[in-house]
Amino acid sequence: MSYTPSSNDLIAISPMLILCGVALLSLVVQFLIPEEDEGKPLWVLSILGILVAMYALYHTTNSPGYGKFFGSQISISPLTVWLSAIYLIAGLITLLVAPPFLSQHKTLFPEFFPLMLFCLSGMMFLTSGYDLIVIFVGLEILSLSLYVMIGMARTSVSALESAMKYFLLGTFSSGFMLLGIAFLYGGSGTTNLDGALRGLSLKGYEANFSKLGLGLFFVGVSFKAALVPFHSWTPDVYEGAQTPITGFMASAGKASALGLVIILFNHIPMGEMGNVWKYLMGTIALISMTWGNIVALKQDNLKRMLAYSSISHAGYIVAGIACGAGLEALYYLFSYSLLNLAAFAIISYLEQGKHEVTVNGISHLSGEHPFTALALSLVFLSFAGFPPLIGFWTKLFLLQKMAESDLFFHRVLLFGAVANSCIAFYYYMKITIQSYMKQETGVVAGARDLPSLPTLGFLIFLLCVFFTAGWIFFQPGSLL
């Protein structure tokens, strides 16, 4: 059956088309620029592409508006628009932070820029897709781009090892997802998201196929979200990849996987089977947040600490989703992505191409580099949920939503989230204590301080965010 796209169909996916078009243009332009430019024209072109895609994304909310497009293959909703905004903001910040670091390591290859744009378009297709095939294709575009970006540091053994490990395990998880799609199609007769999951409410072999299919599909999604027990790749890949790439993975990459979890939960039929899946994912979330925090306590390398911390944060978000959080989980994703980008940007600055940033290595950082110490401490205090920083508001609203339910299991998840927040507070505070209260000078004290003007701008931005956070969430309609 042939299908001719309408103008509204094309406008609905215009942000993705712009990103892909600029990426293809970049592949051509790289052969026309002199080698000594180190990709500066590509850098400018990529930033312009993301800014135009942001405008197109905003325009889609007015014309053609929210709805289904391409014969219900694509869905544009407030949730997908906000998720896409998170990806584009994360990509823009990464493009601003990464080039100096990559140049220092002699790994700023021209292909980095189109790969970033392809990766962003894959993320947007992943969460805007209303068909399991579209979702899978978006996931593969995202994954293949990340595999190559991680492995671009060809002289780094750890980066190549990380890329290979992520590629092999990612391919394995993609196989589970594809097999899950096959079973969902076998149980429902359609790959349309709503119809495929409706097979769970049927009787007989169709329901069994659908249950098995959804389970296999969730295995792949849990791998991308780094939920226990599919998390083993996270610390090694985060540590081995170049720091700006790690920050992008931990922000936009994590947001895309968890955004897909939100979408899937919105489409699982209500009733007994829906409750079973909520109990299952809630249990995985509880184990993830506990395991991530306990192992993070023992880490000295900041990148590995943030890797295990990301496992626990994924647990918080999925626990909230299992308790019915929608807006709250979205806001958590937004703030968590910003904090991750800030944390890895500061770490990349401290590394200076030669240092491995450890907890002991930042001793007395405030005495040598006060602006850097202040920025680093604010970010980690916000991770810990220290009031009134942005991290405090995100956890407060998520925990409030979890506390609204009287179900015993939801109370268990609430208690687990609060207890784990207390555990996490210890190792986040350790960063501030080490940088302000230790007299011995650490290894990274020889690094340059962050420029005062950008640092002050970053702090003002944080202040604006946490002061407006409460207003935003007490008027949820302002978001969706």
UniProtKB/Swiss-Prot annotation:
**Transmembrane portions of the chain:** 13-33, 41-61, 81-101, 107-127, 132-152, 167-187, 212-232, 245-265, 276-296, 314-334, 373-393, 413-433, 454-474
**Taxonomic source organism:** Leptospira biflexa serovar Patoc (strain Patoc 1 / Ames)
Principal subcellular localisation of the protein: membrane
Q: What is this protein called?
A: NADH-quinone oxidoreductase subunit N
Q: Which UniProt keywords apply?
A: Cell inner membrane, Cell membrane, Membrane, NAD, Quinone, Translocase, Transmembrane, Transmembrane helix, Transport, Ubiquinone
Q: What GO terms fall under cellular component here?
A: plasma membrane
Tell me the membrane topology, using the record's own terms.
Answer: Multi-pass membrane protein
At the top of the EC hierarchy, this enzyme's class is: translocase
A Pfam family (short name) is: Proton_antipo_M
EC identifiers of the protein:
7.1.1.-
Q: Name one GO biological process term.
A: ATP synthesis coupled electron transport
Q: Which InterPro entries match?
A: NADH-Q_OxRdtase_suN/2, ND/Mrp_TM
Concerning NCBIfam families, the annotation shows: NDH_I_N
Q: State the compartments where it is located.
A: Cell inner membrane
The reactions it catalyses are:
a quinone + NADH + 5 H(+)(in) = a quinol + NAD(+) + 4 H(+)(out)
Q: Which residues form a coiled coil?
A: none
Concerning its family, UniProt says: Belongs to the complex I subunit 2 family.
Biological role stated in the UniProt entry: NDH-1 shuttles electrons from NADH, via FMN and iron-sulfur (Fe-S) centers, to quinones in the respiratory chain. The immediate electron acceptor for the enzyme in this species is believed to be ubiquinone. Couples the redox reaction to proton translocation (for every two electrons transferred, four hydrogen ions are translocated across the cytoplasmic membrane), and thus conserves the redox energy in a proton gradient.
Record text on subunit structure and interactions? NDH-1 is composed of 14 different subunits. Subunits NuoA, H, J, K, L, M, N constitute the membrane sector of the complex.
Q: Name one GO molecular function term.
A: quinone binding
| Presence of keyword Oxidoreductase | no
